Structures are given as C-alpha cells and as structure tokens.
C-alpha cells in the first residue's frame, strides 16, 4: 500500500536530481502523488475505510499547498510538474 524504498528513491532522483534533494517542492508533490495513487487503489477495494479516506484527503490538501507555493515562486517549475505528473490544473 505504501511506496517502497526503491520507488521513493526513483521518484526523488527523477524530480530532484539527486537522492538528497528530498526537500524540493517538485519531489514533495511527486511523493504525495504516489501516496495518493496508492491510497486511491486501497479505497477502491475497501470503500468503508473512513480513516484511510481522511488520510487521503489530508494528503491531497498538503499537495495542494505545495503546488500553490510552487506556482507563486516559479510558474515554469509548476507547469513542468503538472505536465509530468498529469495533474489537473
């Protein structure tokens, strides 16, 4: 259900350039998106799991905040992340 260590390091190197760049906004958005995808699959199997649904909504809110920050700081990086992750905005 959660991201494996290999998946997480692949996402970090793809969006951050190096494994140490975990604080970049692009990396954070990509990691949130991976976790959101996993939770969405879990909730399709278990529709009555209200606690996981709350966690999903919290992750979506966190991702939205980081995306808003990125849009205000650097619109080009924001557009690139949106295009790479196929997010609606």
Swiss-Prot record:
The keyword Repeat does not apply. It comes from the Bacteria. Keywords: Ribonucleoprotein, Ribosomal protein, RNA-binding, rRNA-binding. SUPFAM superfamilies: S15/NS1 RNA-binding domain. Disulfide bonds: none annotated. GO terms for biological process: translation. SMART domains: Ribosomal_S15. One of its GO terms (molecular function) is rRNA binding. One of its GO terms (cellular component) is cytosolic small ribosomal subunit. One of the primary rRNA binding proteins, it binds directly to 16S rRNA where it helps nucleate assembly of the platform of the 30S subunit by binding and bridging several RNA helices of the 16S rRNA. This is Small ribosomal subunit protein uS15.
